């Protein structure tokens, strides 16, 4: 009998073991869809980004005009740009849901998978930040100025570091050129890191909502979950196409329709919505270095999740107290996102400070304590 190429060919065999014959727990829910959704987001972003890069000019005098030209004169250029800009929002929605799932179901106990995932998040945030600068509108320019300036808070080397990043004494042509180069490069780095992330995941296999081993009862990924994933793709592309076709500028800042002008500062400098929670934490501390450290800690705190797990149960499925805290954390992040979009004045300052404090308190103190308390209640 002729050998099955799917199982014998060295390259096809790898694809088969990752996407077709992969043994998968039979009880994983829709929350396990987000990994593949992130994959399709990345593919969409790379494709639309490549098409945009063909018409873009990374020069301060031409960048804004080249984006306008793409939208006006290139066949379906407006659609490609709208898909790329709103695709970033979908990407972040998916990654935040994916991380939330990981925290709720204790997936962070797969330490290597979790840590590579956080590195992926940081790379994605860097990519989105440098990408936002490229249209060279007012918010692009001032966002780049404000965020890169934060590095000057680093003692001793800060100022040198910022001028080195800028390629001069302010955000100018060299900055735009290097940001374009980075924005082109980083998605391919993300693709490479994704493969590492998956390699680590397939070492242990997927977690499941019960948090117990499922080695005794697994089903092949295809056709069961491949079909379920395609449903997920359709449900994700629906809001993406709706945004891109009906309200393409809903999530953008109107300031970015004005070409960058170093002499005019916008009244409210703020990043895209998916960074607002971190921006609110940054602003809640009245000291520059303190703010930068809090900003870094707001994401890097995820590295501590495996160390802060004190419960004898892996998931929160049967832990109502931890569940309440988890949803409190989600609400807290929504409040931070809202506060980040508001001007720096009363009452937003105090709301932001309280929300920032409760964010760190919940993750560092309340969740581990509740885990230990639940062990006691259940006589573990």
Curated annotation (Swiss-Prot):
Cell compartment(s), UniProt: Mitochondrion inner membrane
InterPro entries xref list: Cyt_b/b6_C, Cyt_b/b6_C_sf, Cyt_b/b6_N, Cytb/b6-like_sf, Cytochrome_b, Cytochrome_b_C_euk/bac, Cytochrome_b_N_euk/bac, Di-haem_cyt_TM
Binding positions (heme b b566): 98, 197
Keyword Heme appears in the UniProt entry: yes
Cofactor: heme b
Source species: Falco peregrinus (Peregrine falcon)
Miscellaneous comment text of the record: Heme 1 (or BL or b562) is low-potential and absorbs at about 562 nm, and heme 2 (or BH or b566) is high-potential and absorbs at about 566 nm.
Binding-site residues for heme b b562, renumbered to this chain: 84, 183
Protein name: Cytochrome b
């Amino acid at each position: 009998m002729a050998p099955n190429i799917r199982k014998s060919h060295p390259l096809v065999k790898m694809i088969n073991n990752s996407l077709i014959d992969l043994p998968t727990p039979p009880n994983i829910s829709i929350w396990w869809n987000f990994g593949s959704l992130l994959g399709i987001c990345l593919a969409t972003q790379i494709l639309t980004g490549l098409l945009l890069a063909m018409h873009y000019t990374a020069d301060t005098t031409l960048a804004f005009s080249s984006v306008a030209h793409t939208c006006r004169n290139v066949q379906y250029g407006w659609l490609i740009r709208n898909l790329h800009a709103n695709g970033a929002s979908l990407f972040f929605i998916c990654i935040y849901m994916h991380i939330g799932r990981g925290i709720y179901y204790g997936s962070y106990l797969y330490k290597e998978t979790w840590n590579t995932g956080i590195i992926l998040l940081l790379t994605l945030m860097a990519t989105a930040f440098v990408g936002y600068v490229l249209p060279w509108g007012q918010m692009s320019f001032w966002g780049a100025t404000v965020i890169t300036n934060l590095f000057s808070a680093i003692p001793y080397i800060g100022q040198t570091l910022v001028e080195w990043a800028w390629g001069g004494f302010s955000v100018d042509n060299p900055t735009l050129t290097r940001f374009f180069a980075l924005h082109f490069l980083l998605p391919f780095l993300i693709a490479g890191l994704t493969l590492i992330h998956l390699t680590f995941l397939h070492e242990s296999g997927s977690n499941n909502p019960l948090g117990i081993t499922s080695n005794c009862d697994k089903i092949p990924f295809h056709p069961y979950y491949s079909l379920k994933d395609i449903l997920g793709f359709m449900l994700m592309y629906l809001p993406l196409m709706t945004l891109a076709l009906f309200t393409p500028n809903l999530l953008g800042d109107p300031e970015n329709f004005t070409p960058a002008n170093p002499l005019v500062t916008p009244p409210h400098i703020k990043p895209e919505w998916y960074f607002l929670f971190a921006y609110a934490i940054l602003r809640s501390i009245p000291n520059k270095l303190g703010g930068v450290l809090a900003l870094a800690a707001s994401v890097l705190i995820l590295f501590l999740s495996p160390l802060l797990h004190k419960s004898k149960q892996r998931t929160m499925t049967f832990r109502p107290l931890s569940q309440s805290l988890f949803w409190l954390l989600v609400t807290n992040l929504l409040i931070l996102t809202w506060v980040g979009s508001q001007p720096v004045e009363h009452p937003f300052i105090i709301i932001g400070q309280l929300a920032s404090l409760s964010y760190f308190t919940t993750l560092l103190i309340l969740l581990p304590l509740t885990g230990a308390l639940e062990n006691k209640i259940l006589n573990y």
